[in-house]
Amino acid sequence: MTDKRKDGSGKLLYCSFCGKSQHEVRKLIAGPSVYICDECVDLCNDIIREEIKEVAPHRERSALPTPHEIRRHLDDYVIGQEQAKKVLAVAVYNHYKRLRNGDSSNGIELGKSNILLIGPTGSGKTLLAETLARFLDVPFTMADATTLTEAGYVGEDVENIIQKLLQKCDYDVQKAQRGIVYIDEIDKISRKSDNPSITRDVSGEGVQQALLKLIEGTIAAVPPQGGRKHPQQEFLQVDTSKILFICGGAFAGLDKVIEQRTDTGRGIGFNATVKGSAEKATEGELLSHVEPGDLIKFGLIPEFIGRLPVVATLRELSEDALIQILREPKNALTKQYQALFNLEGVELEFRDEALTAIAKKAMVRKTGARGLRSIVEAALLETMYDLPSLESVDKVVIDESVIAGHSEPLLIYGKHETQQASGE
């Protein structure tokens, strides 16, 4: 097509769509025996844009994974915690279904379901949240509740959480409003006593109060591109009612609170029922019976608990589960180190007894899955230090004695020469 004012005969030209002459428009574009003006081009673009907006939600609805699909994906990366996965899958599915139907269905407003994860250190709380965000392809950010303070005090303002989320998606507000925020160590902002204090608790109850509106849903004013706030500045307006908040914490001591409530057999004197150690419920079993009243007694304020209606509890990982974590997930720790050694052209083998020894060590340390990496890293440190300087190494073997610190990894050379790594 070409831009024309007159045809070769000097005849006045008109737009074939709106009928305006070439003198009434800025541009007239010629096609085979037809003309279109710049105004009609703009109008066509507007029509197409509107239609794309209408079609997009229908495409998104069909692409929303079901709870079963979400659960299956979590199974690929997270070992155990079956009940927590099910709770998360349903809550996340309902949240994004609400967003894609405009927050209401047949005039009924759909409430927001934020999530509270309760479980010991290293049980998979953070990994579950990260895996969900990656699977759903939505922006994800983490915040540490212990660094947060009320606005006006030294520390991190709660609205900085939204700023971090915006940074993850290049300050695209629409993308950020579909994101997931994980707030860790939420148990550390419990108030210091059951009774409301007349003094300010800026890092405990004060932070809970500051988080209330953010989690429930408010329009957060965030400075563009991470600048500081000042009165003359234009702010980005972010609707937090569309953001899914997942709060997690170990809640050490919460099991004792639940035990006090559920222990109906307590008594004094000769008729008292005394439970043996075998009859006592485990921490994981007790946490699965958590109720809002227990969390209030622990130190969370009722209004804050009300904003986290979906509660999922995670159990402490067993030795068998830790061995599975080392071996089975798509990004299992042993697979990561094997890939690292493959970059050097070396095969890395973990014997079964080595995996058992790693799991036992993590159980003793009570660090859960989080402590596995440090154990493996310590066992492989000397080998990873020496390996780039060694030639003809085909294979490195890790057995139980290496994990126990009694020997160095076994190096197998190309000419079938075998020796212990340096240090022996």
Curated annotation (Swiss-Prot):
Gene3D superfamilies to which the protein is assigned, alphabetical: 1.10.8.60, ClpX chaperone, C4-type zinc finger domain, P-loop containing nucleotide triphosphate hydrolases
Pfam family, one: zf-C4_ClpX
Biological processes per GO annotation: cell division; proteolysis involved in protein catabolic process
Signal peptide region: none
InterPro entries attached to this UniProt entry: AAA+_ATPase (IPR003593), ATP-dep_Clp_protease_ClpX (IPR050052), ATPase_AAA_core (IPR003959), Clp_ATPase_C (IPR019489), Clp_protease_ATP-bd_su_ClpX (IPR004487), ClpX_bact (IPR046425), P-loop_NTPase (IPR027417), Znf_CppX_C4 (IPR010603)
Binding site for ATP: 120-127
SUPFAM superfamilies referenced in this protein's UniProt entry, alphabetically: Glucocorticoid receptor-like (DNA-binding domain), P-loop containing nucleoside triphosphate hydrolases
Any one Gene Ontology cellular component term annotated for this protein: HslUV protease complex
Domain ClpX-type ZB positions: 2-56
Keywords: ATP-binding, Chaperone, Metal-binding, Nucleotide-binding, Zinc
Listed GO MF terms: ATP binding; ATP hydrolysis activity; ATP-dependent protein folding chaperone; protein dimerization activity; unfolded protein binding; zinc ion binding
Binding site for Zn(2+): 15, 18, 37, 40
Family matches, as PROSITE patterns: CLPX_ZB (PS51902)
Alphabetical list of HAMAP family matching this protein: ClpX
Function text: ATP-dependent specificity component of the Clp protease. It directs the protease to specific substrates. Can perform chaperone functions in the absence of ClpP.
Family: Belongs to the ClpX chaperone family.
Subunit organization: Component of the ClpX-ClpP complex. Forms a hexameric ring that, in the presence of ATP, binds to fourteen ClpP subunits assembled into a disk-like structure with a central cavity, resembling the structure of eukaryotic proteasomes.
Name under which the protein is recorded: ATP-dependent Clp protease ATP-binding subunit ClpX
The organism of origin for this protein: Pectobacterium atrosepticum (strain SCRI 1043 / ATCC BAA-672) (Erwinia carotovora subsp. atroseptica)
